Amino acid sequence: MAGRTVTRADLCEAVYQQVGLSRTESAQLVEMVLKEIADCLARGETVKLSSFGSFVVREKGERVGRNPKTGEEVPIEPRRVMVFKPSSILKHRINGTVGDGLDED
């Protein structure tokens, strides 16, 4: 069921083919966009791409975990995690269904 994996090189090639920039300029554009998204997330900002979805950074508090081998309780440090929430349009597109055209994110 798994399809092929799309890489940075694939994205650069798609920009090259569809936008008409040189391969070097296409690669630079893709890198700039990905860097900006990563920088925003590192600052704790939400990145919302209309009709695609949102990348959200969430804070997870400290909690107690358990070592599965020994059963010993171990504290799990607080951390930040990134979550992707797809838009309803993307969900409908993936599932091949017709949506109402309204983006809920």
From Swiss-Prot:
SMART domains listed in its UniProt record: BHL
Gene (name only): ihfA
InterPro entries associated with the record: Hist_DNA-bd, Histone-like_DNA-bd_CS, IHF-like_DNA-bd_dom_sf, IHF_alpha
Tagged with keyword Transcription regulation: yes
UniProt subunit comment: Heterodimer of an alpha and a beta chain.
Species for this entry: Xanthobacter autotrophicus (strain ATCC BAA-1158 / Py2)
Annotated coiled-coil segments of the chain: none
PANTHER family found in the cross-reference section: DNA-BINDING PROTEIN HU, INTEGRATION HOST FACTOR SUBUNIT ALPHA
Protein name according to UniProt: Integration host factor subunit alpha
A single cellular component GO annotation: cytosol
Listed GO MF terms: DNA binding; structural constituent of chromatin
GO terms (BP aspect): DNA recombination; positive regulation of metabolic process; regulation of DNA-templated transcription; regulation of translation
Pfam families in the cross-refs: Bac_DNA_binding
Function: This protein is one of the two subunits of integration host factor, a specific DNA-binding protein that functions in genetic recombination as well as in transcriptional and translational control.
Family of the protein in this entry: Belongs to the bacterial histone-like protein family.
Protein keywords: DNA recombination, DNA-binding, Transcription, Transcription regulation, Translation regulation
